[in-house]
Design a protein with these regions (language model features):
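Acidic carboxylate-rich catalytic motifs and surrounding loops in phosphoryl-/glycosyl-chemistry enzymes
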Residues: 55-58, 99-103
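Generic structural signal for well-ordered alpha-helices
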Residues: 1-4, 39-40, 80-84, 111-115
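C-terminal helical cap(s) of enzyme catalytic domains, especially alpha/beta-barrels
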Residues: 104-118
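Short active-site-adjacent structural elements
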Residues: 61-66, 95-96, 105-109
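Active-site-adjacent loop and "lid" segments of alpha/beta metabolic enzymes
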Residues: 68-75, 86
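Charge-rich, low-complexity N-terminal segments
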Residues: 87, 95-98, 102
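A short, acidic, amphipathic alpha-helical segment used as a generic capping/interface helix at domain edges
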Residues: 36-45, 77-89
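Acidic/histidine-rich catalytic cores of soluble enzymes
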Residues: 1-71
Length: 118
């Protein structure tokens, strides 16, 4: 928010959230309540209008560890509810959701799995 405040032409500003980074930084997002609270706080502090994309991945590490270790969808500590909430949230409909998981051979399976959650 401090950086955005300093930018004169805010139409050129965008933010990308990474699901594993969010969890590693200490933001719990795996329950309906924590998901709503985290994105409510994001909107209040930064502004949801600045969210232009999201990196989608599971995490090998728990909340607050400050360790970024991406995992395949459904294979880490995130749980499928998080991904279901993202896929069903209309705010993300026209936003790039970039799969950033470690096993290339699983990408097509993971993409199909995410679409089935919609």
């Amino acid at each position: 928010a401090h950086i955005i405040d300093k930018v004169e032409d805010k139409s050129r500003v965008g933010v990308c959230i990474d699901t594993a980074h969010t969890l590693a930084a200490g933001y719990e997002i795996r329950t309906e309540e924590s998901f709503k609270n985290t994105f409510r706080a994001f909107d209040e502090i930064i502004g949801f209008n600045y969210l232009k994309g999201m990196h989608i991945n599971d995490s090998k590490k728990e909340v607050g560890t400050k360790v970024d270790r991406h995992d395949s969808i459904g294979e880490g500590v995130m749980g499928m509810l998080l991904f279901e909430m993202i896929m069903k949230d209309d705010r993300f409909n026209n936003m790039p959701l970039i799969l950033e998981t470690p096993v290339e051979e699983l990408w097509s399976v993971e993409i199909k799995m995410l679409y089935k959650l919609k």
